[in-house]
From Swiss-Prot:
It comes from Rattus norvegicus (Rat). Residues 124-149, 203-204, 257-264, 350-362, 414-415, 475-483 are extracellular. It is found in: Cell membrane; Apical cell membrane. GO terms for biological process: amino acid import across plasma membrane; amino acid metabolic process; hormone transport; negative regulation of neural precursor cell proliferation; thyroid hormone generation; thyroid hormone metabolic process; thyroid hormone transport; thyroid-stimulating hormone secretion. Residues 1-98, 514-545 are annotated as: Disordered. SUPFAM superfamilies: MFS general substrate transporter. Specific thyroid hormone transmembrane transporter, that mediates both uptake and efflux of thyroid hormone across the cell membrane independently of pH or a Na(+) gradient. Major substrates are the iodothyronines T3 and T4 and to a lesser extent rT3 and 3,3-diiodothyronine (3,3'-T2). Acts as an important mediator of thyroid hormone transport, especially T3, through the blood-brain barrier. Residues 46-70 have a biased composition (Pro residues). It is a multi-pass membrane protein. One of its GO terms (cellular component) is plasma membrane. The lineage of its organism: Eukaryota, Metazoa, Chordata, Craniata, Vertebrata. This is Monocarboxylate transporter 8. Residues 514-529 have a biased composition (Basic and acidic residues). Expressed at highest levels in liver, lower levels in brain, kidney and heart (at protein level). Expressed in microvessels of the blood-brain barrier (BBB) (at protein level).
Amino acid sequence: MALPSPASEEAEGPCQEANQEYQEPVCSPVPEPEPEPEPEPEPEPEPVPVPPPEPQPEPEPQPLPDPAPLPVLGFEAEPVQEPEPTPTVETRGTARGFQPPEGGFGWIVVFAATWCNGSIFGIHNSVGILYSMLLEEEKEKNRQVEFQAAWVGALAMGMIFFCSPIVSIFTDRLGCRITATTGAAVAFIGLHTSSFTSSLSLRYFTYGILFGCGCSFAFQPSLVILGHYFQRRLGLANGVVSAGSSIFSMSFPFLIKMLGDRIKLAQTFQVLSTFMFVLTLLSLTYRPLLPSSQDTPSKRGAHTLRQRFLVQFRKYFNMRVFRQRTYRIWAFGIAAAALGYFVPYVHLMKYVEDKFKEIKETWVLLVCIGATSGLGRLVSGHISDSIPGLKKIYLQVLSFLLLGLMSMMIPLCRDFGGLIVVCLFLGLCDGFFITIMAPIAFELVGPMQASQAIGYLLGMMALPMIAGPPIAGLLRNCFGNYHVAFYFAGVPPIIGAVILFFVPLMHQRMFKKEQRESSKDKMLSHDPDPNGELLPGSPTPEEPI
């Protein structure tokens, strides 16, 4: 019998009471408890935007140092020298990609350079008349004065070439404008002070040294500045400039002869100095376009005395042009020819006065030289533009051969007409030789080193140019006439022509050899230099100086 649970007893209590009252018991359902409402979730706070962290630059990987070489038994390991950093040039532009304007303001520069070449070489090519005037003044003191008087004009002409390496340094460091203006001012002072002295020894300094050095500083920048404004028509520009010298040469003999007859030698120097004064003003138009070199960090970082000396030496004397064999041969050939080049200009007038005493217009010979020189410079300018590469040198070979032969023909002329024909050929050869000198230098060493290449060339010509006329004067004193002197003057140009003949052949041979080597070693070829290119015969790329 199961016992009732306490819950059942509680349920029976109210029912029994209802039965006692005779009422039907009502059982109400127990209400279920209402579920408590779930609390609404609180809204989550909006996240505050956090700025993303700045990206940190990744450190560049440092190159591992080269392992030190293992010492070999019996030898000490030499310290490894780190290569010097590549020098940088702070300029307005680089030579690579530079395009000359080929005109425009360049034609004003051409006019200034024309006046420069015309006034300088117009005076120097008329030195034969000045030489005769000097002899007239000095004959009263010394009968055998030809040797001493010849030094005046020879020094002036020789100093133009002797100072050329120094002028190249000033041109590279200071620019064409400052160098040319300073030189023209010095030339003006030299000519003007020559009028205040009658001493031959003092005129060695005033005319020979001062005037000659000033002309050198004024002349060479006129050759270099044309390469800044012309490239495709550089030969034509050089021809126009050189032709200006011929126009002046045609007028200067007549002018100097007229001044000498009327106002004598001293006042003639004063009149000629005005041309140098005008040149000083015109030289201000030489605005350079190509960059000039400056000091590099590697040069400033030199520590040892030897390094500082080498830095300064390389800074002022760029010897890289002599690494090219073709340039060395070319410069030596022209220097050899220069020994007899200037002899006819100095002694021709005196020779004609001695042999053809009835002829008064001896200056006509210098006019003929100037006229055909201008024609030769114009023609050679056009011809050189059409001749590719170093084949232009063959024009110099031909001109030197004819120049030597014509010098030897002077004593063989029996009449004045024959001398006129000889002088016409002399001027033509002079025009061809002078005009193509700068374009050949650009072809040999490139535009960045052309300035010093021309400077060293003219410097090598200085000694034979100075020595030639005095040697001819000494021969005249020894033999009593100019025959041997002019025969002597014709030999060096012929020798120079033979030397120059081999330069294009050697250049072509070296170019083919380098092409064969470059085709084999393409993977090991040098990177292109930003300032130049590798020239045939040069071990290093062309660089600014």
